[in-house]
């Protein structure tokens, strides 16, 4: 009677765990293994736990799949997937020059973004930003541009070039500063103009008033 109870208990535990009985040759007891399909080239070990005299329950050990080598490697910061696959370094835009003030938008575009502005008779606008509001420029000189890139001693530079051999950058920093200063002098506040023109008008009106007085 006692072996039958142990057998019933083993079958109950086996059915609850989702295992089917599997007889072992040369063993008086009974064992159970999982219903999973056999994997080619892989061996499963069994851990035996004694359930009673003359009987044992076999529980299979699950073999974890091997992880690929690339999963454990961390990507270098600042690189995209395509650049990492091709082995290309990250692109960094070199700065051509340094502006003395960031309010000078033309200098910022030229030095940091390397964008050449479009010179129009009315104003100077950066390429692709037509709605940019910039102060009106003065009259452009129709004479030939001097070929010498060395600035004169009395010319105030608006930027400093990173490379000493960059003649185009040196010419830009020396040439456009005069245009900017000219446009700054040409554009005066409205209040200042009213003060300058208001005096003579008031004196003229006062003289005419005296002439019309009886």
From Swiss-Prot:
One of its GO terms (molecular function) is hormone activity. InterPro entries: Endothelin, Endothelin_toxin_CS, Endothln-like_toxin. The record marks 117-118 as: Cleavage. Residues 185-198 have a biased composition (Basic and acidic residues). GO terms for cellular component: extracellular space. PANTHER family: ENDOTHELIN, ENDOTHELIN-3. This is Endothelin-3.
């Amino acid at each position: 009677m006692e072996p039958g109870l142990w057998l019933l208990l083993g079958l109950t535990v086996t059915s609850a765990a989702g295992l089917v009985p599997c007889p072992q040759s040369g063993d008086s007891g009974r064992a159970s293994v999982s219903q999973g399909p056999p994997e080619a080239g892989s061996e499963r070990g069994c851990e035996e736990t004694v359930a009673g005299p003359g009987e044992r329950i076999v529980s299979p050990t699950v073999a974890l799949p091997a992880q690929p080598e690339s999963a454990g490697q961390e990507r270098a910061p600042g690189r995209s997937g395509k650049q990492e696959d091709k082995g290309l370094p990250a692109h960094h835009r070199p700065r051509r020059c340094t502006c003395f003030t960031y309010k000078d938008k033309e200098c910022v575009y030229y030095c940091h973004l390397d964008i050449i502005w479009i010179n129009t008779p009315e104003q100077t606008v950066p390429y692709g930003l037509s709605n940019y509001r910039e102060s009106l420029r003065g009259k452009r000189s129709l004479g030939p541009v001097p070929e010498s890139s060395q600035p004169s001693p009395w010319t105030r530079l608006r930027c400093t070039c990173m490379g000493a051999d960059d003649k185009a950058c040196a010419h830009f920093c020396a040439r456009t500063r005069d245009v900017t200063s000219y446009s700054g002098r040409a554009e005066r506040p409205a209040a200042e103009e009213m003060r300058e023109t208001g005096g003579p008008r008031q004196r003229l009106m006062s003289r005419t008033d005296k002439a019309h007085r009886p």
